[in-house]
């Protein structure tokens, strides 16, 4: 738990991953000319306990699968795909649209959201990342894969 080199390497990897996903989502939304947001995107702009619960459940499944040889390690990848990638993609879309976005809510629209979409979805990403990290730490400690020494 105190391996500074591994922590730095992990932080750099996560940072590059975040930049890659946000950058790719921005380029694709710019290239496709996205001009309005549907409920799937706006739903990822305000974190709630259900989102955190999904991230924690995915973390339990993913980290537990890594402690068992008979279980596939791809479950950990599914945890990332479910909890981390969607909010990062929404952040990229929000950054591309900037203050010119229009969100569609049912029959009405709301214009001029500035970057609330990007900020809210990035907050969801951070909450999910922290939830996955802490939950995985607990699962690994319960499975005796480390100590506080």
Which residues does each PLM region occupy?
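Alpha-helical transmembrane segments and their membrane-interface boundaries
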Residues: 1-59, 69-72, 117
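Membrane-embedded alpha-helical segments of integral membrane proteins
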Residues: 91-92, 116-144
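Peri-membrane helix termini and adjoining interfacial loops of integral membrane proteins
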Residues: 30-36, 99-109
């Amino acid at each position: 738990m105190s391996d500074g080199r591994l922590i730095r390497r992990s932080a750099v990897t996560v940072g590059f991953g975040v930049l890659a996903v946000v950058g790719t989502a921005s380029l694709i939304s710019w290239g496709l000319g996205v001009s309005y947001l549907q409920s799937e995107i706006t739903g990822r702009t305000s974190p709630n306990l259900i989102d955190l619960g999904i991230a924690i459940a995915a973390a339990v499944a993913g980290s537990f699968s890594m402690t068992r040889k008979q279980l596939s390690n791809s479950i950990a990848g599914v945890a990332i795909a479910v909890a981390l990638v969607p909010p990062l993609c929404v952040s990229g879309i929000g950054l591309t649209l900037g203050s010119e976005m229009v969100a569609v809510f049912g029959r009405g629209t709301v214009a001029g959201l500035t970057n609330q979409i990007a900020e809210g979805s990035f907050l969801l990403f951070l909450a999910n990342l922290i939830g996955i990290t802490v939950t995985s730490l607990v699962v690994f400690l319960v499975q005796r894969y480390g100590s506080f020494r």
